[in-house]
Amino acid sequence: MTDYAKNIQAFYERDDYKALAGQPGATAVEASFKDLTYVPRKTKPLPGMMVGTMLQEFALQPAQPTALYLHIPFCNLRCSYCSFYRNPFEAEQVEEYVQALLAELDFLQQQGVFAKQRPEAVFFGGGTPSVLNPAQISALLNKIHSVAKLADDCEVTFESSIYDLSADKLDACIAGGVNRFSFGVQAFDTHLRRSLGRLNTKEEVTAKLEEVAAKGVKVIIDLIYGLNGQTQAMLLDDIRTALACGVSGMDLYKLQIMHKSPLGQAIAKGNIKYEYNDKMLAEMFVAADALLAEQGAKALSCCHWAMREDERSGYNTLVKSGANIITCGAACGGHMGMYNYMKTMDRSDYVKKATSGQYAVMGMGKHNENYLLLEKLSGQCDSGRFDFALLKQYSDADWESLFKPLLEQWELLDLLYAVDGKYYFTAKGKYYYRQMDRVLLTAAECALYGKPGLMEQAGQKMMGIMKNMK
């Protein structure tokens, strides 16, 4: 039997524990965390050729929470902060890719992937799915309905830019069962939008949001804070503008400066000076969180708010809770049962394999028996609330007691507070939730497996070259 309490002491005895757990910042709104890259332990890497085993085992599994993701890796425009831009829009290449998606959906059905699973969410992401024409949209939606029996209340989300979603595309989406549209607005201010590479004016954006909302479907938008030239007042005005447009939900993300993005490269070369520090960003987020609460929005996670009772952010919730994520397309990863996988990054390679009856996986891993426990723990952190009693079905450990030193420190830092054995994040805690999540998962794995050996530490370092987001 695992001695969790003994094992976790190795984490609390780390020389850098105090820095990892968080210390008071220079002001009340700040906290200081040492950077910690988290890489899951005990995941067994497997070659992509094992994909057949994964599909066979998954086809035999009983019904479980499941989502379906379709990746559309094309964009008409490139945003200045984006490092994921891969394929500019070319009609012939898009059609070729759509045919590959249709073939892949047929293949998954033939393999029995949908035999026992009823997807609770379908998500068209990208890239920009709205580059598809109406016929392509209809073909994909019809194919999904023909190969899979969706849950009765399945959430079907279609990501779109304001620029691309014409009336005929909107109608094709709704006719095919799309009931939720997600727009990467990022900012309403016209000048600020132009600096990001966005063409539409504030007036055009609000008109499109109102047009889609009038169809009776859910409208979700993303906003970014921390953009050069953006003030706190502008961010709060953006939130009020969104609410006036009748949006159903809203995501609020801190700008991530990616090294390979045009913005990241300009900052690295000294051509642009980034204006914000942690104090300013935290103040913006706390003010936004307060306004959303004042307006009656319900926080479903640390970065997503619902304005309608029926908005549940189903796909993201499934992703954060260890559900099966079946993916179609190139350059996307998912989970099936005890396996995770990554699809080929090369679009041409994907098209060739998908149209010849192959599931184009480039690499895989097999989870250990604690995978769901850790996913549920991370999902609770993402939601901004801990209820450790819910973890008992995955582990016999007393996680509240094991995490007590961390929880007490986070209460002192005003990151969370306890009510009847449950813990709720403050606005400050929501701002720092990513750092808290990495610390908590590292501590949990120490409790489960003990202190990592030198070889394991070296492997984690190699796998964690990419810096985690803050």
Positions of predicted regions on the chain:
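Short beta-strand motif preference
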Residues: 68-70, 183, 425
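C-terminal scaffold of the Radical SAM
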Residues: 60, 89-111, 118-397
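Canonical Radical SAM [4Fe-4S] cluster-binding loop centered on the CxxxCxxC motif
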Residues: 62-98
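Active-site catalytic pocket residues across diverse enzymes, especially alpha/beta-hydrolases
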Residues: 86, 112, 440
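Short, solvent-exposed beta-strand edge segments and adjacent coil->beta transition regions
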Residues: 65-67, 153-155, 420
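Short, flexible helix/strand-to-coil boundary loops that buttress conserved ligand/catalytic motifs
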Residues: 83, 109, 437
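Charged, E/D/K/R/S-rich low-complexity terminal regions of large eukaryotic assembly subunits
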Residues: 1, 330-470
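Flexible, acidic/Gly-rich N-terminal and inter-domain linker regions that tether
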Residues: 1-66, 115, 451, 459-469
